[in-house]
Amino acid sequence: MKDCRPGTCSFRPLQAAGRKLKPCAADDLVHLDAGAYGATHGDRILRFFVKLNPSEPRVWSTRGTFPRIYARYGRQAGIAEGAGRAAVVDGPFERIWTRVLATLGDAGLPKATILDSSRYDRRMRRLHNFMKEAPEFRSGVDGLERFEFPPYTAWTVLTDMVSHACLSGQYALVSTFIVPLANCRLRRLAPYEVLQTQPEPVA
C-alpha cells in the first residue's frame, strides 16, 4: 500500500462477550473508528483482522456505512452544524502545530503525534462517542446486520467507513494502517469528503 503508515498491532486473547467496560472502550457497541492515537487529517483507517480461535466464530454487527450514519444521525451527534469545507479543513496555525508534532515524532519522540488533532478528527471522535453513548443510537436497529467469521478466517475493513461491533469471539490479531486519502480511488465516498459535500443530513 503506497505511502501508508503503520498504526497499532494487537492480540485479542479475551472473550469479547460479557466484558464490563465503559461505553467509550466497549467494542461490542456499534461505532465508527476515529483517530485514537493521533489525528488522521482525513486519511483512512484500514484494519486487518485474523481470527485464531479453532472452534468458535467471531461475531460482528454493523449499522451501515458512514454516509448512512451521517445522514441519519449527523444532526443528533452534533457534527452537522456548520458542516462543509471549513468544518474539516484545518487553518494555518493548526497545520503549523501538526508539522511541529510530526517533526518531533521524526526526531525520536513518536508519542508527540498523539497530541495532534484536526477539525476533521474532532468531528469523527464526536460521532464515535455519540454512537457508543447515546441511548437514541444504541437502542436503534435501523440498518442492523450480523456477521459470523468462522475459525481461521481473515478480513479487512476501512473502519472509519463501516460501522462495526464485535459481539463475541476470542483470540484474534488486529493490525492497523493509515492510508493516505489521496491514494484512494473512491475518494468522494470517504468521511472527509462526505462532511464537505453533504453538509445537511437527511432526516
PLM regions and their residue ranges:
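Non-heme Fe(II) oxygenase catalytic core, chiefly the N-lobe of the double-stranded beta-helix
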Residues: 1-123
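Catalytic core of Fe(II)/2-oxoglutarate
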Residues: 59-62, 129-203
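Short, well-ordered alpha-helical scaffold segments within catalytic/effector domains
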Residues: 124-128
